[in-house]
């Protein structure tokens, strides 16, 4: 069954059947119903991809994201899907694992799939990394500070401000030596932002703060193993700040197994707040990053560009979202208030 057969059985032209599918308001109600009755009788489904090519829009967008298993990533996905769903679009998810080659291959694939736009999350690419010509004549938004990937629309979370607020709190508790545990495949910008925030907090507090960097997989197992290595080497930090909540959970488990008390022996904080941070013991001081709002902001930027083809694609559009510090017990806070919002 195809569109020609439908036209023949309904006693109309192929053009009329096409209008029923693409512009039903232009077809007389009785004619429209006759065509639809034939499609129902023969269980005919239009080829929406071919229809999209004809109309110049496939009603699909792509989301290229390093990982889909973290609470942070899931919130970005939720935000993007909310906006896309309201627009009647389908989202194609592409997990890059922070790998440049994988990300580049997905870009090529999305070009052949004729998606209407692409959102890239924490892209590891720069245009100089394109080892073969790749002309992407479609709107693209990048979630992250990296503008070298060729996106002229960017939105990101202010990690430097998040680091400043967190370190400022740690300094008031008397901590001076801070260690950061992050996954360089997923959190490439975090180390530099942490260092900038730490220096600004130190200047404001008129004291010197020191930063050490450690790397581990962004998972509970990654945090557990990383802390075990620290214990074995006798390098337990004064304060350990993790990039992800799962790493922090793994560290809590490793500390308990090693009879190390938090916060008495070591303070613990994380950059990615999640519901679990408030229910473990001790509750983990963390930075709430509005990831769902970030996904929604990126999607809105993308659809504004899709719907307005008069916009100059070379003009940079930048949107920055601010963090919120949630002070709990894991860093030594002694106040009677369960949770502070700074």
Question: Where are the predicted features?
Answer:
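Short beta-strand segments enriched in small/hydrophobic residues
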Residues: 14-19, 53-69, 169, 177-184
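Alpha-helical recognition/docking segments in bacterial nutrient-uptake
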Residues: 56-168, 172, 231-232
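ATP/adenylate-binding site constellation spanning eukaryotic-like Ser/Thr protein kinases
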Residues: 14, 32, 58, 77, ...
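N-terminal helix-turn-helix DNA-binding module of bacterial transcription factors
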Residues: 1-59, 342
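Residues at secondary-structure transition points
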Residues: 1, 22, 26, 30, ...
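A general structural signal for well-ordered alpha-helical segments in protein cores
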Residues: 3, 14, 32, 46, ...
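Short gly/ser/thr-rich secondary-structure transition/capping motifs
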Residues: 41-47, 101, 121-123, 252
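Bacterial carbohydrate/catabolite-sensing allosteric modules
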Residues: 41, 82-87, 111, 135-142, ...
